[in-house]
Design a protein with these regions (language model features):
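Phosphate-coordinating catalytic segments in nucleotide- and nucleic-acid-processing enzymes
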Residues: 1-196
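Walker B catalytic acidic pair
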Residues: 200-202
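H-loop/switch region of ABC-family ATPase nucleotide-binding domains
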Residues: 233-235
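Loop/turn-to-beta-strand initiation segments
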Residues: 193-195, 226-231
Length: 236
C-alpha cells in the first residue's frame, strides 16, 4: 500500500481505543499508547478473508505453493484448522447444502438432495462461501470458548506483553513475514476475548438470496460477543 503514498503529501491517522497510529508526511510511523491501554483492551483474534479465497477451493495442496500473499497464507492456515469442525453432515446456510470432509485425502465435498461433488468441481458460489463460512464459524466458536476463560492482564503481564511486542516490532533482523509470525505466536499465549472478522466482498459469486443468508450467518457469529467486530468491503 506504501506505493500509493506520496512523500510530503500523504498522512494517515488511526485513533483506536488503546493505541493511536500516525503515518506522517515525512514517512515516519508513530505508535502512541492511550492510558491503561491493555487494562481495557479485549485481545482479539483478527481474520482477514481475502477475495482470492476461491483459489484455496480449486487448487490441490495450496499450502505447497510458494510466494502466496501473506493474507492468503494466514487465511489458508486457519482454513486447514477449520476443516476439523466438518463432522457428519455440516450444514451450509445456502441451497440446503452440506459439506462432507474426507481426512484421508483432504477433500471437501458439497452435498445436496440429489448430488455430491468435490468443492474443486462445485460452482464458484460454493468455492467462495465455503472457505469464508468455515473459517468464520470456526474462529467465532473458538474465541467464544476462549472468552469464557479469559481474564484481564495483570500489570506485570501487560508490561511483559508490551515489551515483547516492542522488541519484535523494532528488531530489524526480522522480515515482515517473520515479524507477523512472531507476533502471532506471542498473542497465542493469551486467551482471545474478541473476534474481528474482516471480509472482502462477502457477496462474491452469490445470488442475492444467498448473499442475504450468508450475511445473516456472519452477523450471528459477530453477535456472540459484545467485543466482536465485523468489517466488510463490498461492491453491492
Amino acid at each position: 500500500i506504501s506505493n500509493y503514498f506520496k512523500k510530503g503529501l500523504t498522512e494517515i491517522f488511526y485513533e483506536g481505543d488503546s493505541y493511536n497510529f500516525t503515518y506522517t508526511k515525512e514517512g515516519d510511523f508513530i505508535i502512541k499508547k492511550n492510558t491503561d491501554a491493555l487494562s481495557i483492551y479485549p485481545l482479539p483474534q483478527i481474520m482477514y478473508v481475502p477475495a482470492e479465497r476461491n483459489f484455496i477451493s480449486i487448487v490441490n495442496n495450496p499450502s505447497l505453493i510458494k510466494e502466496l500473499p501473506d493474507s492468503l497464507l494466514t487465511f489458508l492456515s486457519e482454513y486447514d484448522k477449520a476443516k476439523s469442525i466438518i463432522k457428519g453432515d455440516f450444514i451450509l446456510p445456502i441451497n440446503e447444502a452440506s459439506l462432507e470432509y474426507s481426512k484421508s485425502n483432504d477433500t471437501i465435498s458439497v452435498k445436496g438432495n440429489d448430488y455430491k461433488v468435490k468443492l474443486q468441481e462445485a460452482s464458484s458460489g460454493f468455492q467462495s462461501i465455503v472457505p469464508l463460512y468455515l473459517v468464520s464459524r470456526y474462529l467465532s466458536d473458538s474465541v467464544s470458548e476462549q472468552a469464557k476463560h479469559s481474564h484481564k492482564m495483570s500489570n506485570d503481564e501487560a508490561k511483559r506483553f508490551e515489551e515483547e511486542v516492542s522488541r519484535i516490532w523494532s528488531d530489524n533482523n526480522f522480515t515482515d513475514t517473520q515479524r507477523r509470525i512472531a507476533l502471532s505466536a506471542l498473542s497465542a499465549k493469551f486467551n482471545k476475548s474478541a473476534f474481528i472478522n474482516i471480509v472482502e466482498e462477502p457477496e462474491q459469486n452469490l445470488f442475492p438470496k444467498s448473499q442475504s443468508l450468508l450475511m445473516q450467518s456472519l452477523l450471528l457469529f459477530n453477535n456472540k460477543l459484545d467485543a466482536n467486530k465485523l468489517i466488510i468491503t463490498t461492491h453491492s
